Swiss-Prot record:
It catalyses: tRNA(Asp) + L-aspartate + ATP = L-aspartyl-tRNA(Asp) + AMP + diphosphate. This is Aspartate--tRNA ligase. Coiled coil: none annotated. Residues 198-201 are annotated as: Aspartate. It is found in: Cytoplasm. Belongs to the class-II aminoacyl-tRNA synthetase family. Type 1 subfamily. Signal peptide: none annotated. GO terms for molecular function: aspartate-tRNA ligase activity; ATP binding; catalytic activity, acting on a protein; nucleic acid binding; transferase activity.
Amino acid sequence: MKRSMYAGRVREEHIGQEITLKGWVGRRRDLGGLIFIDLRDREGIMQLVINPEKVSAEVMATAESLRSEFVIEVTGQVAAREQANDKLPTGAVELNVTALIVLNTAKTTPFEIKDGIEANDDTRLRYRYLDLRRPEMLENLKLRAKVTHSIRNYLDELEFIDVETPFLSKSTPEGARDYLVPSRVNKGHFYALPQSPQITKQLLMNAGFDRYYQIVKCFRDEDLRGDRQPEFTQVDLETSFLTEQEIQDITESLIARVMKETKGIEVTLPFPRMKYDDAMALYGSDKPDTRFDMLLQDLTEVVRGVDFKVFSEAPAVKAIVVTGAADNYSRKDIDKMTEVAKQYGAKGLAWVKVVDGELNGPVAKFLTGIQEELTTALVLEDKDLVLFVADTLEVANATLGALRGRIAKELGLIDNDKFNFLWVVDWPMFEWSEEEGRYMSAHHPFTLPQEETAHELEGDLAKVRAIAYDIVLNGYELGGGSLRINQKDLQERMFKALGFSTEEANDQFGFLLEAMDYGFPPHGGLAIGLDRFVMLLAGEENIREVIAFPKNNKATDPMTQAPSTVALKQLEELSLQVEEDETNKTN
C-alpha cells in the first residue's frame, strides 16, 4: 500500500479517513486487551490502537510480536482520542488499525531511541544510524537543511553564482596542516584537500564572475574540540568591486533572513562593530560574548606603587569583578580557577573579596593603601569577588577572558535565548608564533593591509593592520573575511614579509601572481562556518550534534573505523611505505 502521509502529520482534520502509515515501532503497551503502539517516522509519533474485536487473529498475533524498532506498515481509520496528549502534535488523534504488516525486524538497540539518552559519544557514533532516529537529532538536521535552503535562496536573489571549486588542490604553507592525497599517476606528488577555496574563489573574481558563492566542504588536519571537525562545511562568498561595508551589509542581511525563516527571530541591523584591540582589552577574547558584563579592567597604574612586587613590577595587571559572588567561591574553588589560569600562561591568580566594606584575601594586606582608589575604579560593593592577573598584557587578557566565560556559565549569567551578533574589525595583519619563531598571517597572506600601515611590511610587522572582519555570535567566531590583495607588487611584498623567498613564493603561488598580470579586479569576501552556525541555532554545544556522520575527538569514525590501514598493493601503487610506529615495536 502507498503511504498516505507521515505519521507525525496526522491531525484532527483527518478524523474518519482511512490512511496507511509506515515507520518504526517506538513503544508497545498492552492495556486491557488492547495493544497501543507509538509509530515513529521523521515527522513525529502517532498512536496506533489494535483492538482484538476489530482485527483478525493474524493481525493480533502480528501486533503481539512487535518489538521496539520493528519497521511496520499499518492501515486504519483516524479517530479522536478519548484523552488527548497535549505534548504531541498528533495527541488529539489515534489510528484504529485494521491491517498490519511487518516490513523488517530489529535487534535490541544499544541505547533507547529517545531524547536525553546517556550513551557515551563513541557508542552514539558507532551506531549513528540509530542515533539519528532520535527526534532531537532529526530536528537538528532538518534545521540545517532549512538554513542551507534559506542561504541559497537569498544569495540566488542577489545574483550570486554557485560555482564548485576543486577538492584536489595544491598544498600551500601557512595555517593548519593539510590532508594530503598521493597521486598514483604522478609518483611522489601529492594533492591537498582544501582548507578553504580561498585562492580559487579569488581567481573566479579575476574571471569576471563578480559574485560567487558555494556551500562547500573544507578540511583541516588539526586538534579537535567541541566546535571543530576535520571536515567541515562553510558558506563561502566572494565579490568584486564592493567595499568592506557593502560585504558586511550583505552578510548581515543574509543572517537576518536565516534567523527569521528558521527561528522566527528578528535581529537588529546593523550589527555592532568592535575593534580587535577593544575586544581583547575588555573581553580578553577576539570573539567576545556580549550577553553578559564582567568586563576586564586595567589596574596597572592603580597598583604601580603597592608594596607587592607581583603587582608593582608586572607589565600589566588586570582584573574582573564577579558581582556578589564572594560566597559562591571558596578558597578551594579559587584554587581550581588558578589551575585554569596557568593553562593560559599565567603564573598565578590573585584575589580579594569585599566583606563588610573591607578587602579580604591573600593579597588584601598589600592593597590597604589604595583600597579607596581600587573600590572607586572597580565600583566595588559588598560580597564582590575580584580576580587579578599580573603578567604580560597578552597573558592577562587571555587568562581573564577564559575565566570570565567559565564563571558566567557556572553562575548562570548567560541568557541562552539571546543571539548577540557583532563584527570584530581592525585586525592586526600578523601574529607572532612562538612555535615558528616568526610572524604569521592572522588570517591568510592574501588579506589587503590598511593603506596607512602598508609601509610597515618592510618595518615593524606588529603595526600592520588588515582590512579584515570577523563576525561573532555569542562568543563563537561565526565567520571571517577581508578585502584581498589584487596588485602583484603588494602581494609579493606580503610574501616577503612572511619570510618567503622569491623562488618559494613563485613555487607555491606563481599561478596567482601570474593572474595578477591580467587585470585582477578589487575584490573581497567572507566565509561563515555552517556547522557552527547551525549548532548555535539548535542550542547545542558540539557541532557533532548537527552533522550527520561526524568524527570523534580522535578524528576517527567509530562506525566505519575510518581512517583504516590499506592493502600493501595500494601503497605500492602510490610508491608509499608506512614506517612502523616506534611505540608499537617490540624488543
